[in-house]
């Protein structure tokens, strides 16, 4: 156990990741790839999403995209500055791009995705200096769950 895993901040990461896992279970029930996501602003969950690509027959119905859409509507702004996204699986290139474009402040990831992950596995779009916005990334929260 590292120092970070024992901190109050890490416990908060686990709390919200558990809700993202609950969202992933909703996708699983629909026979979707079980990925879940929540977005937190000022200590409150403002949006939830889960993978619905097959159900919606829509390429962009990933958990992160669904949650970003709901969070933007809730805040009345496309900018999600000050928001933290909790997602059960490392975002793909589409979702990573949307996260950067939405100006999400932090992304907390459960498991990495060595096949298509764009927060450090295949690419790291979230922390690229070349973009006008970089996202703080925390990896490995409740990875075994």
Question: What are the language-model segments listed below?
Answer:
Residues 31-35, 81:
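Short, basic and Ser/Thr-rich N-terminal targeting/leader segments
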Residues 77-89:
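Immediate flanking context of iron-sulfur cluster ligation sites
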Residues 35-43:
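Short beta-strand scaffold segments in enzyme catalytic cores
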Residues 1-30, 94-145:
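Zinc-dependent deaminase
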Residues 55-65:
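A short, polar/charged loop-to-alpha-helix boundary motif
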Residues 41-42, 69, 81:
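A cytosolic small-molecule/anion-sensing beta-strand core signal
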């Amino acid at each position: 156990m590292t120092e970070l895993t024992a901190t109050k901040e890490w416990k908060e990461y686990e709390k919200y990741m558990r809700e993202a896992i609950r969202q992933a279970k909703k996708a699983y029930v629909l026979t979707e790839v079980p990925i879940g996501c929540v977005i937190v602003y000022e200590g409150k969950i403002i949006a939830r999403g889960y993978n619905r690509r097959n159900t919606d027959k829509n390429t962009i119905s990933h958990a992160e995209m669904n949650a970003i859409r709901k969070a933007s509507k809730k805040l009345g702004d496309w900018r999600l500055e000050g928001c933290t996204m909790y997602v059960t699986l490392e975002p793909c290139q589409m979702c990573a791009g949307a996260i950067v474009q939405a100006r999400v402040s932090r992304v907390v990831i459960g498991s990495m995705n060595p096949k298509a992950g764009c927060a450090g596995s295949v690419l790291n779009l979230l922390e690229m200096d070349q973009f006008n916005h970089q996202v703080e990334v925390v990896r490995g929260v409740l990875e075994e769950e």
